[in-house]
Amino acid sequence: MKDRVSITMLDGGIADVRLIRTDKMNALDAAMWAALVEAIETLKATPGLRVVVLSGEGRAFCAGLDLSSLQAERDPGASSAGGTLADRTNGIANNAQYAAWGWRELPVPVIAAVHGVAFGAGS
């Protein structure tokens, strides 16, 4: 998770969650979705959590889907850190779906601190 998403706990139960794939303007790939799911699960189990602030490192919040990662997934023999889009990894949802939906399951407000680019799945 640490190469795609970081969580820093601040005073007062504030979780600072950051997308950290600046070379691709925080574009989403299978590893990013898996890291977001892991972050959500970590936050669910964090005692004293009061609020989550989600932001992106660098000059963009999130450039949306990393299309090159989809091409790599189609290549025979390619392995993907977060599974394929077809894999149901979270009940009836895949990691990409749960990375978006899971924030709703947190019992605290989630604030998106959007700056710069925010396209498609990143908006």
Description of each model-found segment:
Residues 27, 62, 121:
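Residues that form or flank phosphate/diphosphate-binding pockets in enzymes
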Residues 97-123:
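Glycine-rich beta-to-alpha active-site loop
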Residues 56-102, 118:
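Glycine- (often His-adjacent) and acidic-residue-rich active-site loop
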Residues 28, 67, 114:
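Hydrophobic pocket-lining residues within nucleotide cofactor-binding pockets
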Residues 1-57, 73:
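Conserved CoA-thioester-binding segment of acyl-CoA-metabolizing enzymes
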Residues 20, 65, 115:
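Histidine-centered beta-alpha loop that forms part of the nucleotide-sugar donor binding/catalytic region
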